[in-house]
């Protein structure tokens, strides 16, 4: 029974599972630094962070187990083809580094909060955070560049061309979707992550000036590269919307993915430009210098700040647009019904499926972007509206993450128990003996997939 349950669970692994870490993790970050702070919210953030860590460890272990079993049953080449060349799976590897970044950001916040209380522990934690950040950056680059190359290299003819006259037309009709952004958004996320700690006091005590400068430069290069790449893909997706129209009901929540680079990009550029100003103020003092040097020392950092503010507001403006379009698209399916072929159940747009998770992280990034704009510039110009918007986006993100988490736990517990029972009965029948494998076409396993199918989003 236990073996059947484990094998059934192993078969359900998909890189998309790390989306749960993203949603719960960013919720913990939002609660920790909520626009209207409260002690009980800080306590809730610790709980959400613990849940995010547990999910990350569990999914990581499941991924390793899935890899071992898959290679044992088939081969590494088939694993590579299925999970790195097949666009139903490879795009979702981007959720892994983004989920890890939410954990890194929370650990960085804890390190900064304990700078005076426990300097030694805070310093050691910051070093650990910095090492994790470099690991995450490496993973982001491998995924963004590697998966993009595999997609561009050739078509992966898993299902053939179907009713299309060529692979080109099939690609244009089926795969020009917002999920293409999932492999590039991690670059935006990891670039903004280093901005949260690079110029902090504890980072200054743990590392020298050269490390800070190198980190700032790499952060800037990563952010610029990612934003350009993102807008190229968004332009392609706009073309798809004009040609193929909005996604079908089961995929409509993927529209929210467009909010991710907008909110996180604004958050990142605000932190980056503010860190440049802090760096100049710290290492280029205005004492004993000429008037021209003093003007440059003051003007150059503020030029970056102004560019950061304008860029952030432009990205947030697009984020508001995508928010409205996404909500209206969902509402347009309110009266539509679909019947599942496998179970015959009637599905509505509000029937829970894994696509619901696609709304959590993007809403959280919009909260971070709005709140950071308020924090940095409210001292010069009243910007309370952005604080309110950050609260609204953050509240939706946290509540939606909790809803998705509870519904996911319910679906998994129900379907896994069902799959294990059916597999056990099937293998013990007197007429047919079958070795229960994660890759055998057993009826019970197929039935369990109906509500847990991640590939419908790709």
UniProtKB/Swiss-Prot annotation:
Organism: Saccharomyces cerevisiae (strain ATCC 204508 / S288c) (Baker's yeast)
One GO-annotated biological process of the protein: sulfite transmembrane transport
Function: Involved in efflux of free sulfite. Mutations in the SSU1 gene cause sensitivity to sulfite.
Keywords, alphabetical: Cell membrane, Membrane, Phosphoprotein, Transmembrane, Transmembrane helix, Transport
Protein name: Sulfite efflux pump SSU1
CDD domains from the UniProt entry: TDT_SSU1 (cd09318)
Gene behind the chain: SSU1
Keyword Transcription: no
Phenotype when changing residue 344 to E: In strain: Sgu52F
Cell membrane keyword on record: yes
GO terms of molecular function: sulfite transmembrane transporter activity
Extracellular topological domain: 33-48, 111-135, 198-220, 276-309, 372-387
Coiled-coil intervals: none
Main location: membrane
Gene3D superfamilies xrefs: Voltage-dependent anion channel
UniProt cross-references to InterPro entries, sorted A to Z: SLAC1/Mae1/Ssu1/TehA (IPR004695), Sulfite_efflux_TDT (IPR051629), Voltage-dep_anion_channel_sf (IPR038665)
Result for mutant: residue 345 to R: In strain: ATCC 76625 / YPH499, MMW1-15 and MMW1-2
Pfam families linked: SLAC1
Parts of the chain on the Cytoplasmic side: 1-11, 70-89, 157-176, 242-252, 331-350, 409-458
């Amino acid at each position: 029974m236990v073996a059947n349950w484990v094998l059934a669970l192993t078969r359900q692994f998909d890189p998309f599972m790390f989306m749960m870490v993203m949603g719960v993790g960013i919720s913990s970050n939002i609660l920790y630094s909520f626009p209207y702070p409260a002690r009980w919210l800080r306590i809730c953030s610790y709980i959400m962070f613990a849940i995010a860590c547990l999910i990350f460890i569990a999914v990581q272990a499941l991924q390793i187990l899935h890899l071992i079993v898959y290679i044992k049953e088939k081969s590494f080449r088939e694993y590579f083809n299925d999970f790195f060349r097949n666009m139903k799976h490879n795009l979702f590897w981007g959720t892994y580094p983004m989920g890890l970044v939410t954990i890194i950001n929370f650990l960085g916040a804890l390190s900064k909060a304990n700078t005076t209380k426990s300097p030694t522990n805070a310093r050691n934690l910051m070093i650990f955070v910095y090492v994790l950040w470099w690991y995450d950056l490496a993973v982001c680059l491998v995924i963004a560049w590697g998966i993009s190359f595999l997609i561009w290299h050739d078509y992966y003819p898993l299902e053939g061309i179907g009713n299309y006259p060529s692979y080109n037309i099939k690609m244009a009709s089926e795969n020009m979707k917002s999920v293409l952004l999932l492999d590039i958004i991690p670059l935006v996320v990891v670039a903004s992550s280093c901005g949260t700690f690079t110029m902090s006091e504890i980072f200054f005590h743990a590392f020298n000036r050269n490390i800070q400068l190198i980190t700032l430069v790499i952060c800037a290069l990563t952010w610029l590269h990612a934003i350009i790449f993102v807008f190229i893909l968004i332009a392609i997706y706009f073309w798809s919307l004009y040609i193929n129209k909005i996604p079908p009901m089961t995929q409509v929540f993927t529209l929210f993915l467009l909010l991710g680079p907008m909110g996180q990009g604004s958050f990142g550029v605000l932190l980056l430009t503010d860190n440049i100003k802090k760096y100049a103020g710290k290492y280029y003092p205005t004492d004993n210098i000429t008037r021209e040097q003093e003007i440059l020392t003051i003007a150059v950092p503020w030029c970056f700040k102004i560019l950061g503010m304008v860029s952030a507001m432009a990205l947030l403006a697009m984020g508001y647009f995508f928010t409205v379009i996404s909500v209206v698209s969902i509402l347009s399916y309110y009266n539509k019904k679909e019947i599942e072929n496998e179970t015959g159940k009637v599905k509505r747009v509000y029937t829970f499926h894994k696509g619901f998770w696609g709304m959590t992280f993007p809403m959280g990034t919009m909260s971070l972007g709005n709140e950071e704009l308020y924090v940095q510039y409210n001292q010069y110009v009243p910007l309370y509206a952005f604080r309110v918007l950050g609260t609204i986006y953050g509240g939706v993100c946290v509540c939606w993450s909790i809803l998705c988490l509870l519904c996911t736990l319910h679906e998994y517990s129900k379907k896994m128990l069902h799959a294990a029972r059916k597999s056990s009965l099937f293998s013990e029948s007197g007429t047919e003996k079958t070795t229960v494998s994660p890759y055998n076409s057993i009826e019970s396993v197929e039935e369990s997939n109906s509500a847990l199918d991640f590939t419908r989003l790709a």
